[in-house]
Amino acid sequence: MPDLTGQLNRTSSYATSFGGLSDIWRCIWHKNGSNTQVAVKSIRSQALDEKDVKKKNRRLLRELKVWSRLRHDNIVPLYGTVSGFGQFVSLVCPWYDNGSLSGYLESHSETLSIIRRFQLLSDVSAGLQYLHSCSVVHGDLTGSNVLISSDGRAHLSDFGLSVIAVEFVGMSYFTSALNGTVRWIAPELLAIPEEEGATAIPTPNSDIYSFGCILFQVLTGKPPYYEFKRDAQVVVAISLGTQPSRPELPVIFDHHWSFIKDCWSIKDRRPSSQQVDEYIKSQLYFLQHDTSSPD
């Protein structure tokens, strides 16, 4: 995996955006005489001694090596790593001008047709199935970790990083959920572990729950649990077994709502990523060939 240290220039003195556990920098990569816009993601952490930093960097690089080998149209490519943006090595990926799925839906929700929405969902389901076929669990599938390219395609990013970030910062999923991802996290990951110090580990089943939340978000233009303004309220709702409520508007067709509920069922009864991808693509095919459906 290439070390791009010394090949990047920051476009500003400060990070462009801040995630729950990381910072994003917009940079220019000087490559073979041309300039390419890239995003540099650095994992935030508390102060560590040099020995601990080296140990965690080795762990991070092992995980990133898996990402660097992945090749799929709906997976954000990892160009390499870079030092100098924090205590740990940082990731270098393409810069997506259309930003995240959440931001894209906020900006375009009024104009997106049902076909266009299912095209986005088809991209997400295809990327997720590919990850699972490579024995990779995403672990943090949210509207912020799906990026939209200039041609309007959706690409999955940051898979596997949530577990590392939680380890590095030394917190549980329950605590990290309050950093803005709780609306997409499977309930079993928020359960208080029986053993002290143990932490819940994401699985393909928990990814499917999160996909159900993405499906909800794309069809409605609203995040799951939109009726609650604060994430702490969402945590309480999940602890009580309350699932996101079905909005009156926009209308979600019964068969789509039924499939969302399947994704939110108890973990052993959720569909596989292959079944999810087949369902989404069958719905897209039907919409594209239904003469009564709006474009």
Model-predicted segments: where are they?
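Short beta-strand micro-motifs within the conserved protein kinase catalytic domain, predominantly
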Residues: 77-89
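Glycine-rich ATP phosphate-binding loop
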Residues: 23-48
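Activation segment signature within eukaryotic-like protein kinase domains
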Residues: 120-121
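Activation segment/activation loop of eukaryotic-type protein kinase catalytic domains
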Residues: 149-183
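Catalytic-loop of the protein kinase fold
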Residues: 132-149
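Conserved catalytic-loop aspartate of Hanks-type protein kinases
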Residues: 207
